[in-house]
């Protein structure tokens, strides 16, 4: 990575359930960060068009109505919508990592995915990361990512990657991201919460009422940074109370909480709550070198002779055309001679049987 690079965390509220207006707000935020000379800007989980805080809504018919609206306001990659975002990153000369709900690019599908879209400073789409396993009630909203979503991107500022929310608690995924050479990590979340005894008991964090240390985000991100020796830009969604639909009140956790840490888990910017802001920090590659001198997860502190990680599987495709078995030409010649037929005739027979 570069010896010094300025990065930014965009704690800005989406225009809830309005794709076009939220894209417009994203472009204005990208422009502002570009003027501040940031080279990487990270938005919150599902910034476009907002997190589905209605995910557990009853009755199911009302949930279904929300789901259809969510589909209509989700992002297709690529599309004219991503072109608008790409133009903004090109003009601002920065890389953007944008949390979004993505609608499937598979013909005939309306499935949604919890995605981070990465766009380069040249306006080209670097790629995407789809959340591998939606959490709890999220499985009623989003599909699952696959092996193609375990990836990093080599850029002029360094090797960047990102994962979503509770993926930061997936030990093997963290190890995979480190093994892929990630240097700068983009972490996205739906908010900041107080957790009472277990993950199923959450409420929105209120700075004047609660201790932020009850939220697992802070510990997960600082440990991710230390374990992988990466810089982490962590962005949690913020939606003001007065803009949160009443239907979503039971799962209103959108308190913000963006922060930035170095590879030792030390704050470069501490968490900020309940307001829109862009946090900036200068990343110093020497922080990473110092940490790796003490604890290098891919070098002198690794024991690959004892413990190794395997990436398995292939990208999921609905249609797979079976490849025909190819016989070795010398084997065909021997078989033709054995049965007294021409090689060309044997090839035709095998082809008709579908095995040649």
Regions found by a protein language model. Give the residues of each.
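Short hydrophobic alpha-helix segments
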Residues: 122, 128-129, 271
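Short beta-strand scaffold segments in enzyme catalytic cores
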Residues: 98-100, 114-118, 151, 258-260, ...
């Amino acid at each position: 990575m570069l010896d010094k690079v300025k990065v930014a965390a965009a704690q800005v509220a989406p225009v809830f359930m309005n794709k076009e207006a939220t894209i417009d707000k994203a472009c204005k935020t990208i422009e502002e960060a570009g003027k501040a000379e940031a080279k990487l800007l990270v938005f919150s989980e599902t910034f476009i068009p907002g997190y589905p805080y209605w995910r557990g809504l009853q009755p199911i018919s009302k949930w279904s109505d929300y789901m259809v609206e969510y589909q209509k306001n989700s992002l297709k990659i690529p599309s004219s919508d991503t072109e608008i975002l790409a133009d903004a990153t090109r003009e601002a000369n920065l890389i953007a990592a944008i949390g979004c709900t993505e609608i499937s690019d598979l013909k005939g599908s309306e499935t949604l995915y919890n995605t981070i879209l990465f766009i380069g400073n040249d306006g080209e789409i670097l790629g995407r990361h789809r959340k591998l396993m939606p959490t709890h009630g999220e499985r009623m909203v989003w599909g699952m990512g696959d092996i193609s979503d375990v990836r990093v991107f080599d850029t002029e500022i360094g090797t960047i990657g990102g994962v979503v929310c509770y993926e930061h608690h997936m030990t093997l995924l963290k190890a995979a991201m480190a093994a892929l050479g990630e240097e700068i990590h983009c972490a996205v979340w739906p908010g900041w919460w107080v957790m009472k005894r277990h993950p199923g008991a959450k409420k929105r964090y209120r700075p004047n009422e609660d201790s932020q240390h009850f939220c697992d985000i802070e510990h997960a991100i600082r440990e991710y940074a230390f374990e992988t020796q990466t810089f982490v830009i962590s962005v949690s969604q913020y939606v003001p109370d007065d803009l949160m639909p009443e239907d979503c009140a039971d799962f209103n956790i959108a308190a913000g909480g963006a922060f930035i840490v170095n590879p030792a888990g030390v704050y470069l910017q501490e968490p900020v709550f309940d307001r829109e802001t862009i946090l900036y920090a200068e990343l110093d590659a020497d922080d990473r070198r110092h940490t790796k001198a003490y604890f290098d997860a891919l070098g002198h502190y690794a024991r690959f002779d004892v413990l190794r990680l395997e990436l398995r599987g292939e990208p999921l495709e609905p249609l797979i055309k079976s490849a025909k078995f190819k016989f070795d030409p010398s084997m065909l010649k021997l078989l033709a001679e054995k049965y007294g037929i021409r090689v060309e005739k044997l090839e035709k027979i095998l082809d008709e049987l579908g095995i040649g």
